[in-house]
Amino acid sequence: VVVPYQKSQNVDHLRRGALAKWASRSAIILIAGLGIHAGCDARELDPAKTYLPATRFSIIDVVPPAPVQGDARYDADREIFLKTRGLQNSDRWRLATRDVSERPADLLQDFSGPAGLNLTPQNAPRLTALLVTAAADTARVNNEAKNYFRRQRPFKIDAGPICQPAAEVSDSYDYPSGHTTRGWTWASLLAQLLPGRASQILARGRAYGESRIVCGVHNASAVEAGRLSASATLTVMQRSPRFQADMAAALRELDRLKRQAAANSIIGTPGDQIIPSIFTPQNHPERVGR
């Protein structure tokens, strides 16, 4: 069912070509020793610190408009937010709380099980640099849509518990989800590099985005848009010579780690178990990665 979008007055006054400076807490990404920094306008990218082409790429033309009252997606967002408040203090709530972190070391740990490898910034510096640089690019582009739609976060619309301090997210917008964009960027690239573990890796990336719904800081529609935003931007950067070179370097690094893991018989970790979607019916048989 295609629901026609009705532009709200608070969106009408926004200038289509405007880009806000990246001022959120995720604007600066720094890994000691890697020298990776992201803090500029999407149209002022330093060629040495981005995989994006110089040509203009507008994510606003790609993602669906943010839901407004009268849109069926708006009503679905309200229902999902209220129902998922019942997950407070559950195992899934605790996972969502852990997924609040965007630190590269924590993300590498989260994806280690699905990847079947112990990944750290120390043993995989080229992989870490690739993922951080790509995620900075996808986040910059995603921020354009955030500042265009300026949609409120769900806990500002309906009352309910959230899994992180409201002050950490109250000064930024809901749609599309930046956390989801980051998680899907990491998952997509890791799945490209480790296709034999793609199911487990992509499922973890999906769960990372769904954690924002469970946490109560993003609407379900914002999570869906965050995945699309990441995928679209990743598609645009594929032809970048620097991106291709960094992918090749990361692949060599992973091949070395796989050889070391095989020698120590540690491939095949508890991460083989795929985290069920929060939208999976209770009677759906649990699936295990192959």
What are the roles of these predicted feature ranges?
Residues 189-193, 232-236, 240:
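Active-site catalytic microenvironments for nucleophilic, acid-base chemistry
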Residues 242-290:
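Acidic, carboxylate-rich catalytic segments that either coordinate divalent cations
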Residues 208-236:
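Interfacial helix-loop-helix junctions of multi-pass membrane proteins
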Residues 34-46:
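Bacterial Sec-dependent signal peptides at the C-terminal "C-region" and cleavage site
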Residues 25-35:
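Bacterial N-terminal signal peptides
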Residues 1-21:
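N-terminal secretory signal peptides that target proteins for export/translocation
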Residues 21, 175, 218:
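Catalytic tyrosine of NAD(P)H-dependent dehydrogenase/reductases that use a Tyr as the general acid/base
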Residues 43-214, 246, 257, 279, ...:
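Hydrophobic alpha-helical bundle signature of multipass membrane enzymes
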